[in-house]
A protein has these predicted regions:
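Membrane-interfacial, low-structure loops and terminal tails that flank and connect transmembrane helices
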Residues: 1-4, 74-80
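Hydrophobic transmembrane helix segments
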Residues: 26-34
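Perimembrane loop-to-helix junctions flanking transmembrane segments
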Residues: 33-48
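Non-cytosolic membrane-interface motifs at loop->transmembrane helix junctions
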Residues: 107-118
């Protein structure tokens, strides 16, 4: 029992990263430096979807590092893998590009509405290193995936409401959640997130391309989980989640998401094509679901 708890505690920070960070939406007014302001419409940026995601992400990366340090100190085992080489090369390129950048602060912290500077990019690399070493058992993988899917379902439900013109962030409750009391009085009435004339899904990411990329990954992941699920209840559960991710993927109208699914599908067919074809009944059922979802959204 103690060993199980210890396994879960090691990967809890990873579970929090994949579940909490994507769902964060909060208003922040950011004063821009002179260099960035010349490329922006104002000398400040009103951010809802990126700044606090960055802060929570970096905070949880620190927590994951502590977990990783404790694990290495106790287990005295660092997994050996070739993946460290490309990760190291990428890390070197990030550091060099920041050093030689003319806009150092932008390189470090990122650009308005996309705060993915050097610190965050290094955080992405560290996530891979931590995951390689900390995720050692099926229990741990299931634990992290459970957190991810719960978050993805919640984000997916928000997306469906957006598609049908019922954006949660346009309701009073939604606005109060993403605005402080002071800012609610100032900007709540004029707050609006729209993309053209269509109810395009942006979920909790603002940019539909980011949403499309997120749902593309979750769509392909849950598609595989659906096929290899054991038991009718698990099959139905993962099938329903897969259809929800599919609906949001379509509703985001993201070219990046489309390319992601196409590329992933080729890899999936290459690796698991025979197993999927053998399970043709499950394939037929989910494809009927895709058709129904597509028809409902047309």
């Amino acid at each position: 029992m103690k060993s199980k708890i210890k396994e879960y505690l090691y990967v809890l920070p990873l579970a929090l990263i994949v579940s909490i960070v994507p769902i964060i939406v909060r208003y922040k007014k950011i004063e821009l430096g002179e260099v960035i302001a010349t490329y922006w419409t104002r000398n400040y940026n009103t951010d809802f979807f990126s700044y606090y995601k960055m802060l929570f992400f970096l905070g949880l990366i620190l927590l994951t590092f502590i977990s990783f340090y404790i694990y290495i100190k106790k287990e005295k085992e660092l997994k050996k893998t070739f993946y460290y080489i490309p990760l190291g090369i990428y890390l070197l390129m990030i550091v060099l590009s920041t050093i030689f950048s003319e806009a150092k602060l932008t390189s470090l912290y990122g650009f308005p509405d996309r705060y993915e500077g050097m610190a965050v990019l290094i955080g992405y690399i560290l996530i891979v290193v931590f995951a390689i070493n900390l995720l050692r058992s099926k229990r741990q993988i299931k634990f992290v995936l459970t957190f991810l899917l719960i978050s993805a379902v919640l984000i997916g439900v928000l997306g469906i409401y957006q598609f049908y013109g019922m954006d949660f962030f346009q309701t009073e409750i939604g606005k109060r959640l993403i605005l402080s009391a002071e800012n609610f009085e100032k900007i709540a009435e004029k707050l609006e997130f729209r993309f053209g004339d269509n109810n395009i899904i942006y979920a909790t990411f603002y940019n539909p391309n980011y949403a499309g990329s997120f749902f593309a990954m979750l769509f392909m992941l849950t598609f595989v989980m659906y096929f290899f699920a054991e038991g009718r209840q698990n099959k139905l559960l993962f099938g329903a989640i897969n259809l929800l991710m599919f609906a949001n993927w379509l509703g985001s109208l993201s070219r990046a998401g489309i390319l992601g699914v196409l590329f992933s599908s080729f890899i999936l067919l290459f690796l698991l094509g025979r197993k999927i074809i053998k399970n043709w009944k499950s394939l037929l059922i989910i494809f009927i679901g895709f058709i129904l979802v597509f028809t409902a959204g047309s």
